[in-house]
């Protein structure tokens, strides 16, 4: 099993090209099922979850051609299977996003209950309840969600009991082919949801309220394929910016989307960074200074993203002063904390809050990645640890970061993949 070895780094310097957003690419790949003609995506990252999504689409009978250079073509002309099996779904929660498209276009879907990162329950009941409101008959049996509808799904007025990115995406895709108007209230406003909506509109969907908490979808009878470019990955961007801040460096992120990162950029400025940006780039400069501790509280977009929480725990661990990091989205999302404590971090958990007293250096150690973003935080920690840090179980990293070691190497870090 692959591991990463990391040596203490000089300040990171240089430029890094940001990949397409995993959390936008996965639902957009599933949206390909809705299209009656060929669908071509670009800026798709080379990731394990993307590969799993392509396998799932092929398993259903779709033709999926990886054209190179981050381009994928999908044809559903011969799609004739409607079951997403456990073997594929168990490794990736986003597999649940095939449910809405299959049901909306073909009237039937059997989807195994999902797996993915072990960061809490993340129930699928919001997905199912919304689809039932649109006329679907659903039962959960022997580990599978079995959904059927006679004819087309029907437009409905859906109020989400809690904000859910995945449920918003599933219902948005289903509503695009429903009969009548669907209104989704308390919808997730994440940029990746907006990216999916823009893709659906390019396919012929009628959606208003994009980027707000109320989405209105006027269902159409059919959708066509299109060419669409996936948005840049704001979490990958934030990860590299935090790494630069922790190492007191100066970097430039190309192919970035500053507009989707206001909460993160504001906290980096609070930490003492000079942040400048253009339409598709962001520069961060620490001027050689140690960052200052910041207080973080995760919440749905446009507030601070839960997917950047672990990285900012490391920033606070190596900052001047004391910072508090409060997690409100997922339970059990501080699994990186015991590993960071093993590296010498001064951290204490009080319920959903981690209180962190900053120090100058950590100590290299063998640590274990427990989920995707925790993995990234351990890599950043290794850049400011004396000696060698060995990060085990990096298959989590490969689910969400494209060529992470080579990108860090391009910024001057000693991050090496070993068997």
Swiss-Prot record:
Q: Where is the active site?
A: 117 (proton donor)
Q: Which UniProt keywords apply?
A: Cell cycle, Cell division, Cell shape, Cell wall biogenesis/degradation, Cytoplasm, Peptidoglycan synthesis, Pyruvate, Transferase
| SUPFAM superfamilies (UniProt xref) | EPT/RTPC-like
The keyword Acetylation is annotated on this UniProt entry: no
Q: Sites of the modification 2-(S-cysteinyl)pyruvic acid O-phosphothioketal?
A: 117
Pathway given for this chain reads: Cell wall biogenesis; peptidoglycan biosynthesis
For biological process, the GO terms are: cell division; cell wall organization; peptidoglycan biosynthetic process; regulation of cell shape; UDP-N-acetylgalactosamine biosynthetic process
Q: Where is this chain primarily localised?
A: cytoplasm
Which residues participate in phosphoenolpyruvate binding?
Answer: 22-23
Annotated GO molecular function terms are: UDP-N-acetylglucosamine 1-carboxyvinyltransferase activity
Question: What EC identifiers does the entry list?
Answer: 2.5.1.7
Which cellular components does GO assign to this protein?
cytoplasm
Listed binding positions for UDP-N-acetyl-alpha-D-glucosamine are 93, 307, 329
Where does the UniProt annotation locate this protein? Cytoplasm
Q: Does the keyword Cell cycle apply?
A: yes
Catalyzed reaction equations: phosphoenolpyruvate + UDP-N-acetyl-alpha-D-glucosamine = UDP-N-acetyl-3-O-(1-carboxyvinyl)-alpha-D-glucosamine + phosphate
Please name the Pfam families in this protein's record.
EPSP_synthase (PF00275)
What InterPro entries does this protein's entry cite? Enolpyruvate_Tfrase_dom (IPR001986), Enolpyruvate_Tfrase_sf (IPR036968), MurA_subfamily (IPR050068), RNA3'P_cycl/enolpyr_Trfase_a/b (IPR013792), UDP_GlcNAc_COvinyl_MurA (IPR005750)
- Gene3D superfamilies per record: Enolpyruvate transferase domain
What is this protein's function? Cell wall formation. Adds enolpyruvyl to UDP-N-acetylglucosamine.
Hey, which family's this protein in? Belongs to the EPSP synthase family. MurA subfamily.
Give the protein name, as stated in the record.
UDP-N-acetylglucosamine 1-carboxyvinyltransferase
Q: Please give the organism.
A: Shewanella denitrificans (strain OS217 / ATCC BAA-1090 / DSM 15013)
Lineage of the species this protein comes from: Bacteria, Pseudomonadati, Pseudomonadota, Gammaproteobacteria, Alteromonadales
Q: What gene codes for this chain?
A: murA
